[in-house]
């Protein structure tokens, strides 16, 4: 018997169906940029994970960008070592902000969720620096 209360991971195509053409195009561009960050700074395995779970990773990436826009202290250079307490803080924050069934995607990949969040902060920072 199927559990009707259980949600599933949303596909990006489903999200884009309810968006106008411009927003849909922006989502495609941002997902492409997110994957470039993962490919640039991370392992092939993690890149493939993010490709497989685009919508979930896109959500975490976007959360990083929004966090940076609200407080630029969230930014950490993805090439630099990270304070373990900061990493734990972000992982705890993500796990409490994302619904449990969606967060389950990252069980065993919590550090990747943290890094995708950081890539989101870095993405917005690069955009801001490019505009100045």
Task: Place the predicted regions along the sequence by residue.
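Short intrinsically disordered terminal tails
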Residues: 1-17, 84, 126-132
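Generic detector of low-complexity/intrinsically disordered segments
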Residues: 14, 36-37, 96, 114, ...
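Compositionally biased, intrinsically disordered low-complexity regions
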Residues: 16, 21-24, 32, 66-70, ...
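Intrinsic-disorder/low-complexity peptide segments enriched for small residues
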Residues: 10, 32-33, 110, 116, ...
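Short terminal alpha-helical segments
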Residues: 7-43
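Acidic, low-complexity, intrinsically disordered interaction modules
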Residues: 41, 47-119, 124
